[in-house]
Amino acid sequence: MVFKLLEQAGIKIDLDDEPKKVQTAPQFDDDDENEIRIVIVGVGGSGNNTITRLYDLGVQGAELIAMNTDAQALKHAKAHKKLLLGKDLTQGKGSGGDPEVGYRAAEASAHEIAETIGDADLVFITAGMGNGTGTGAAPVVARVIKERARHNGRFREPLVISVVTYPFKNEGKIREEKAKAGIKALLYYSDTVVIIENDKLLQLVPKLPINAAFRFADEIIARMVKGITETIKLPSMVNIDFADVYSIMHNGGAALIGIGESDSSNRAVDAVKNALQNKLLDVEYGSGEKALVHFTVGPDVSLGEINEAMNIVYEKLGEKSEIKWGARIDEDMGKMVRAMVIMTGVKSPHILGGETALQLPVKESLLPAEPKAGFNSFEDKIYKVISRKSDEKPGSDMRGYINKLLADFDDLS
């Protein structure tokens, strides 16, 4: 079902952890000013792992950027560009698992973040939720991208798609609550936040050791981002253009990804059925408003097979759903068909009841030329969602807590 993806991740079926040889990524080249510019940013340890995997895979048509508060981890990451966040604050020693440190470090580096990313049309942000740098810094990165575009008078703001992992239950309640708040903070400034629930991932491959499971999560994110990027940028069996992706993902709120593979006699249909069954987030179908479906296929797959598979998607999601799809040929797939379904506008308990009403419009603000001091700005109030005071119990009513914070917004406009 997903064994080909495991193989491509360098995870053997016998659970041998020896990685397979990977290809080297070409240098990023973006000389054509009329080209859609795509940037992929990995924030924190988990995000850096995804960027490294994308670099090894050789994703074409996108610039890869790694950001971290840990200088040693950043040194080992593979990317076209790297940025150490909050150098004067953390001295390159990391966040210690504290989202507030990640947030402060990103705030102190806001100008550098803007300059490193530059002007882009589509930005993917990858991070792990529940720890320090990814949880605290990723929302700041998303905000800076939007603010730079507004500050520069861009007619259309960049499309920001965040792709994050949600921790295992056995990682503890504290980390889970940090992750929920981090996702909610990301929703303020991302158009769409794709959430991959680690426990759901483990259900697909229950016998994997924990380190291989994390690598599998990196592979899913990397393949998803690579697939969308190259289907936009390169000639494909069926292209998805940037306008299609923008239509589905703009103001999409929270999103899930489902993944499936098959080499059966009815492989495309079975791959889609598996993808719809293998949801990597706890949601009910029917709650999503829009969907993006991407197929990775071998050279002998026909368009008729793909069309038949898409009929399953239309039947499952309903006539009123807006659905875009594309397909790319990958010689390594052989007889296998892989389907990835991204559904936006979903409701999940991991985003505080699943409501997207708190996805606020970006406030006008100039990019800081110097690090901010104190905690009095609009962004600092938003950050209180991430960094909750120690006297608040993890099981407290976070919904009420956020609403109380949002009550201050009117005073800031």
From Swiss-Prot:
Q: Which Pfam families did the record assign? A: FtsZ_C, Tubulin
Q: Which cysteines are joined by disulfide bonds?
A: none
Cite the InterPro entries for this sequence. Cell_div_FtsZ, Cell_div_FtsZ_CS, FtsZ/CetZ, FtsZ_C, Tub_FtsZ_C, Tubulin/FtsZ_2-layer-sand-dom, Tubulin/FtsZ_GTPase_sf, Tubulin_FtsZ_GTPase
* Subcellular location, principal: cytoplasm
The alphabetical list of record keywords is: Cell cycle, Cell division, Cytoplasm, GTP-binding, Nucleotide-binding, Septation
Gene Ontology biological process terms in this record: cell division; FtsZ-dependent cytokinesis; protein polymerization
Q: Residues that bind GTP, according to the entry?
A: G132, T133, G134, E171, R175, D218
Question: Could you name the domain of life of the organism this protein comes from?
Answer: Archaea
Q: Where in the cell is it found?
A: Cytoplasm
PROSITE patterns in alphabetical order? FTSZ_1, FTSZ_2
Record's GO cellular component terms: cell division site; cytoplasm
Molecular function, one GO term: GTPase activity
The record's function comment reads:
Essential cell division protein that forms a contractile ring structure (Z ring) at the future cell division site. The regulation of the ring assembly controls the timing and the location of cell division. One of the functions of the FtsZ ring is to recruit other cell division proteins to the septum to produce a new cell wall between the dividing cells. Binds GTP and shows GTPase activity.
Query: How does this chain assemble?
Result: Homodimer. Polymerizes to form a dynamic ring structure in a strictly GTP-dependent manner. Interacts directly with several other division proteins.
Homology family: Belongs to the FtsZ family.
* Name the UniProt record assigns to this protein: Cell division protein FtsZ 2
Q: Which gene encodes it?
A: ftsZ2
